[in-house]
From Swiss-Prot:
Tissue specificity remark: Expressed by the skin glands.
Any single GO BP term: defense response to Gram-negative bacterium
Protein name, entry field: Figainin 2
Physiological role: Antimicrobial peptide that displays antibacterial, antiprotozoal, and antiviral activity. Exhibits antibacterial activity against the Gram-positive bacteria S.epidermidis ATCC 12228 (MIC=4 uM), E.casseliflavus ATCC 700327 (MIC=4 uM), S.aureus ATCC 25923 (MIC=8 uM) and E.faecalis ATCC 29212 (MIC=8 uM), and the Gram-negative bacteria E.coli ATCC 25922 (MIC=8 uM), K.pneumoniae ATCC 13883 (MIC=8 uM), the multi-resistant clinical isolate strain K.pneumoniae carbapanemase (KPC) MR (MIC=16 uM), and P.aeruginosa ATCC 27853 (MIC=32 uM).
Locations listed in the record: Secreted
UniProt family annotation: Belongs to the frog skin active peptide (FSAP) family.
Pfam families membership: FSAP_sig_propep
Basic and acidic residues composition bias: residue spans: 23-39
Keywords per UniProt: Amphibian defense peptide, Antibiotic, Antimicrobial, Antiviral protein, Cleavage on pair of basic residues, Cytolysis, Hemolysis, Immunity, Innate immunity, Secreted, Signal
Length: 84
């Protein structure tokens, strides 16, 4: 009976040790994956920032063009109006 208890204890102990090793490896793998995802997110965020800056720049150009059109177009139309 003592032999059976020792064998059972040994099996349980080795099983728990192997499970803890597997859990460690799984945790390390998850940490590596999270780190990789964060790096990819940063790269995408940098690309997104560039696109956002381009959109802001385009918006500024459109505003300037609109302001110029408001001031220049009346001048041009007055210049080409037939004088009476």
């Amino acid at each position: 009976m003592a032999f059976l208890k020792k064998s059972l204890f040994l099996v349980l102990f080795l099983g728990i040790v192997s499970l803890s090793v597997c859990e460690e490896e799984k945790r390390e793998g998850e940490e590596k994956e999270e780190k990789r995802e964060e790096e990819e997110g940063k790269e995408e965020n940098e690309d997104g920032n560039e696109e956002h800056k381009e959109k802001r720049f385009l918006g500024a150009i459109l505003k300037i063009g609109h302001a110029l059109a408001k001031t220049v177009l009346p001048m041009v139309t007055n210049a080409f109006k037939p004088k009476q």
